[in-house]
Amino acid sequence: MNRREFLKCCSLLGASVALGRTSADAKWLTNEKANGFPQGMLVIDAHAHPDIFPCTDFFCDKTSTLEDIMNIGMNASCFAVVEDENPAGGFQRLIGHLLDVIALEAEGKIKIMRRRSDLPHSSHPPGFTPGAILAVEGATPLETDPNRIDELYDLGVRLITPMHKKINLIGDIMTAVPSNGGLTAVGQQMVERMVSLGIIVDIAHAHINTLQGVAEIARINDVPIIDSHTSLTHRENPYGTTRLRAFEEMEMIAETGGVVCTWPMGWYVDDSHHRTSFLDWAKENLEIAREIGIEHVGLGTDGGGGLPALIDDYESILDLPKLVEAMDEVGFKRSEIAAYMGGNLFRVMKQCIG
């Protein structure tokens, strides 16, 4: 039995034991709440755009806002900026978006997490300031210049999602016919620079052939990678048409020590294939945990990013305590829920950013 098989067996055993609990074992849910979350539970959202995109006549997503992050007592959230639609002048516009987030720190509203010691472990002291993981989604504006990664790092960026909605010089995406054949030579140089600086590499949106190349670099350098916002596909052949991951892909991430983060996106195919409730979300988390280990599953809402559909009764991150309750209902132990809600991502952060 290898390490992966051993961890999987441990996960199955833990889940089976948890499923046998009585309602009395779940009293911690009602007796220790603070702002909706159990007291002391570390909560980190691996992917969100809080107040990043202004509302227009065509788009308005307030599912993650700084106000709600503070009200619910979330320890930290990703603040991901995007500028990959128009390459011309994209890097300078990207810098401008990052400076807008950095201005929030100057106003005392957030604490940008440049090192693990910046994470606020307690979310309710007087004058609480939530942590912010400064992130870039879509590395197209970086073009082929690794020095631009250094510039982002100096600003405080600690997470980069190389791929987004368009195929770029780094690799292929999940939602278009691949044309690069995987991670390119330039892409390899860019990812290696991210890793060397201490930037978390997020392979959300990356096609499986690009994921394979990034995962290989991660294994060689002994660092974890993440997919910050996805869920389990129901398709037998998912590749090229969906943002959802198959177990094969999740396993690649887990083998680096990384985390697959699930989101509140809702969908319905038929009565046997649907994801429409908090209970469905929790059951999916259990299924993934049984396959790759609970230590490799986490939370990433994509709040503010305009998900096309949400599960029922999810309006914003203020509803996340309902997921905690649903995960308890399907059999997760308190320690496992805590790992999912933020502990696993914090482990990745400690290993990557120092």
Give the positions of each predicted feature.
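Loop-centered beta-sheet repeat module
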Residues: N180-A215
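N-terminal hydrophobic targeting/anchoring segments and the immediately downstream early-domain regions
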Residues: N2-G20, D25-P178, I225, T233-R235, ...
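A short alpha/beta connector and helix-capping loop motif
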Residues: A215, I220-S231
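Distinct, well-ordered alpha-helical segments
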Residues: D145-I149, N209-I220
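Sec/Tat-exported extracytoplasmic proteins
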Residues: E105, M190, G198, H205, ...
